Amino acid sequence: MGREGGGLLQTRAQYLDRPRCCQPQMRKLVDAWLSRAQGVLWEPRCALCGGLGQFPSFDLCPGCVGDLRRNSFACVSCAEPLSGGVADAANHRLRCGLCLRRPPRFDLARCPFLYDYPLDHLIRGLKYQGRTSHSRLLGQLFAREIREHIASAPPQLLIPVPLAQRRFRRRGYNQAIELGRSLERELAIPLCPDVIARTRDTKEQAGLARAARRRNIKNAFAMLRIPAATHVAIVDDVITTGSTVNEMARVLKRAGIARIEVWAMARAAQAGLNTNSSAMPMNTAMPK
């Protein structure tokens, strides 16, 4: 049997059920051709308002792009939105009170947008309504936001958050993998869904309190293989408390991966958790 909490999955059934890392070369060629042909054969249409999109093949109009709420004042560790009037928390190297008290297992989170209208419409469409075409648009959006920030030291691999088998059977796909495929095309970083897997089905995290989320996800992941990489990015659609990606990062760190980033399209604000009083510079010690 596989060992939980960082062990390798060892049963034949688990091995055969594992997700594949590399897509066939033909699929990559077809995807690339379709992506280029779409902008030539069809006018891009905004996925939100139906107006004219932006060339080439970007399905959002400038007006709807402007309506997206950016996560510009956030903790530099977990990307939790902070209250206050500072325009850019990253320039001030602020960490939230939760990260000061209990640093996450990952090194930093990149969540360029807030989980709010109209972006939540696109994410819910991908996640719950089978609109996998939204993954291409979301990947383009994400790549636009972070490309310059990772230019000097991009991660070597993208690792999507594994979906519980029950939810995978219900949906027929993993939205984190769909988003990861788009990021792989946009940023030329390999997507590897065969590095880590869930060892058991967990309850839906939605609706659970922070402590309950940590208990629910504890020891729910195990390594399928040890990648030849020292810097990776975990990919997901939305971060709420960060419990899932934090548990994944714990297992990946135990496997020897030195630097772990978390990439998500959006960060859901946790009302009342972080205020100006809990936002402190990274080099400031917590008062005893």
What are these regions (language model features)?
Residues 2-236, 240-288:
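Glycine-rich phosphate/pyrophosphate-handling loop used in enzymes and phosphotransfer proteins
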